Amino acid sequence: DKGMICASEQSVTVLESVYKKVKEEFLYRGCYFLKPDELEKVRKTILINGALNAKIVGQKAATIAEMAGIAVPPETKILIGEVESVDISEEFAHEKLSPVLAMYKAKTFDEAIAKAEQLVADGGYGHTSALYIDTREKEKMEKHAAAMKTCRILINTPSSQGGIGDLYNFKLVPSLTLGCGSWGGNSVSENVGVKHLINIKTVAERRENMLWIRTPEKVYFKKGCLPVALDELGTVMHKKRCFIVTDSFLYKNGY
């Protein structure tokens, strides 16, 4: 729906080694890369007085371009701004809820993760992140998952469709209401489904936790057993410690 799904992509960070190929693919798919002067015009259209311009939400890329006073092919699918700053002062770093995408370049995988971390921090913790990678690179996948404070971490999946569940995975419940956990100030960190709308009663009868004790291999008892027991434990069984159970009555009576 032209970026209106809250899980839709807002920014993409690309490794320098494949940046040119990714850019070519975007162009092939009908995206439009903004020129420097056009970039500034779209910046002023994305935010109005520091807040998202509601007029761009869910609009076509060409319509947004027209609002900004620039001309793009009418069939343009996404407006892409190549920017450097991931700071909140960069308009393209914000959630845009429209076919407008920020594109960043990173020299290393670690740098790409750092940029993504900052974008998540600025845009709001807990929502969704996506990683496109060779799935044999498990170490990188784990590093990305550990760094992202997002409740949905998608692999090789378009986030707008993948985040709402069912279409590209079977781990996320189909839903358009996506929980962001305590990171995002929500009570749940998963996709909200039927189970979250049901009141569940639990009848709990009293039960006691089971207790148990492990007894020693040998237990010595009867009057006068202590010297024999200590000798056997030390010389035959080579034990260095023992536990003696007694009380004043037993002690006074020679036990």
Across the structure, where does each feature detected by a protein language model lie?
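ALDH superfamily catalytic-core signature
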Residues: 1-87, 114
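Short, surface-exposed connector motifs at secondary-structure boundaries
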Residues: 3, 120-127, 238-243
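ATP/NTP phosphate-donor binding region
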Residues: 210-255
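Short, charged/polar "capping" segments at the starts of alpha-helices
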Residues: 20-21, 137-141, 248-255
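Short beta-strand/turn micro-motifs composed of small residues
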Residues: 14, 133, 157, 245-246
